Amino acid sequence: MKVKVERTTITKKTTTTKPKPDEEDNNDDNSSSNGVEVTATATATRETSDQLDFLPADLSATISTTTTPTATRATTTRNLILHPFDGMQSAPTLTTPTLTPTTLRSIDEAFYELTGETNNSVNAPFQAGFKPPPLALLPNSGPVVGIGSAVEAIVPAGNTLEIGHQPNLDVLSKLNYSNSIVGSDTDDSNASWNDQHRINGDTTDTSSGATDSTSYQNNSMLGNGSNGSGANNFTGALAANQSTGGRGANNNSNTNTSNSATPAARRGGGRRPNKAFNMTPEEEEKRRIRRERNKAAAARCRKRRVDQTNDLTEEVDALVKKGDTLKAEITTLTELRNQLKYVIEAHLPTCPKVRDDILSVSTCNGLIGPAALHSTGGSSCGSVHSNHSHNNNNNNNNSNDSSSGTITGFDATLNSTGRSHSPLDLKPVHIDENLLLAIKHEPLDNGLDSESSSLDQDGPPPAKRAVPLPTIAQLTASLTTPTNPNGGSLNTPIVSQAPVSFAAFAANANNPNSPTLNLLNKGPKARPNTLAVQRPFAAPMQLNASGTGGVVDGKGAPIQIQGVPIQTPSTGVFNFDSLMDGGTGLTPVSGPLIPNCSSQNKHPLELPTPTTEPSKLCPL
């Protein structure tokens, strides 16, 4: 890392002198060419020089090596010209330290090269790459503050650092870079911890590897070849520190420079020591009892967990065995079923019993009867049919279609007999024409049959069919009876039946021997897919030439359809309630309605009911 610094310094000549070290060659590698170069003059002049500066700009003094035997102190503000920094995380600021482990290692290597270029015998112990143990400084030397802590480091003017042209091992002992540059904070904190806990003498297993370096340094200063009885042996280090006396105190004060400034380090986690000094025997006894109880509880918990695991394992094994047994049984039953199925299929073509059952089928109402009915023959079906043809029951829901050959319902007696004697399902077969005579007819109400009415099956429910229909004479009289002076209008009595065709009434009146619907339904009839709607008037209405209706060829006689006089347009009003109840709707609710503009009301719902005015229903 190269830092170009233009600095104007005012130097003062002092009485302290320094030998001139060898200057570093500029052709060396950039990683090891980070040195300190300061140009000073013996007089009060100003000079501008380029050098490498590793200290922040706000420091008041710096350690410098000059070309003259004088030690200089910077008294003026330095102007820093910062160039790109290689290997640094960020640019140096007033709060960010500019010294990184890389720069510290470079400084260390630079001093090694300066002190070990010409003397290979001195540099031989450092070929392994480790730092030598710290040695004591010269007496009357000021405190050397580690550069790694990024604080001010001042070399007093009254102290001399003798650095000869031929460097030797004393340079390392005087500068003490190995202890002040690298790892000073960790060692100082551990040393302070040792000083504070020297009285207790309590050793735990939570010591880190950094504490070993402190014991190693203490043993090295004392010249001991062994590190104690163990890797983490604080006892030997503490005993060595206590036995040294004043020399050990000086060593601690010189090497661990940040002892007073560093607070006591907190111990980490881990178990507490087995024996505490501030515990009473009662507390120790309580602790021992509590630990015994905890151990017993933990043992019981482990035993219970093991027992539960064993029980579950045994249960799982039993269930697995049971599952295997069931699978084997299922396999055996499946094979047996396949064998029986094969035997039945092989025996079916040659079985005479099955052939007789198929040929001698006893049917009743288009259904295949069970085998139990074979003994009774067709008489049972005939008796059942005869009984049901004269009784009114709920057999209408069990109606079936004979022509299609499908089963839509079962007779109660037949169904119960089939369930009790026939284990096989009843299947539909093709019905022969000879079996149509045995089909049960759907009975109608006795009242309707006695009156010989011709109501269609698609009419209202049977409860409303019990009311007899009016005759042709009654209907004609009601149509021709006038209800007001304006003329004849429709005056049909209210009935709760469906409207009947006039043509059917006329035909039935002329031919009393005409067959009814029950007689017409004797033969087979296919179920219709659509609903047949018949017009109420068989013949079309005849209109006069003027289109007004009511008069044909200038005559005043009304139009007659099948003998029923009809006026066109009709002056009657169809009753909506009668239509909804299943009636004809021909009963007028009031006199004839003559629509005009004055009688129309835009809000018919606001009319009071009943009213004397003509009804506001729209005429058809």
UniProtKB/Swiss-Prot annotation:
Parts of the chain that traverse the membrane: none
Entry GO MF terms: DNA binding; DNA-binding transcription factor activity, RNA polymerase II-specific; RNA polymerase II cis-regulatory region sequence-specific DNA binding
Low complexity bias spans: 201-233, 249-266, 377-405
Domain bZIP stretches: 284-347
Chain spans, region Leucine-zipper: 312-340
Ranges where the record places region Basic motif: 286-305
UniProt GO BP: embryo development ending in birth or egg hatching
Phosphoserine found at: S422
Region described as Disordered: spans on this chain: 1-36, 184-288, 375-414, 447-466, 590-620
GO cellular component: nucleus
Pfam families the record matches: bZIP_1
Subcellular location: Nucleus
Alphabetic keyword roster: Activator, DNA-binding, Nucleus, Phosphoprotein, Transcription, Transcription regulation
Main location: nucleus
Main function: Developmentally regulated transcription factor AP-1 binds and recognizes the enhancer DNA sequence: 5'-TGA[CG]TCA-3'. May play a role in the function or determination of a particular subset of cells in the developing embryo. It is able to carry out its function either independently of or in conjunction with Jra.
PANTHER family, per database record: ACTIVATING TRANSCRIPTION FACTOR 3-RELATED, FOS TRANSCRIPTION FACTOR-RELATED
Similarity section: Belongs to the bZIP family. Fos subfamily.
Protein name (record): Transcription factor kayak
Organism: Drosophila willistoni (Fruit fly)
Organism classification: Eukaryota, Metazoa, Ecdysozoa, Arthropoda, Hexapoda
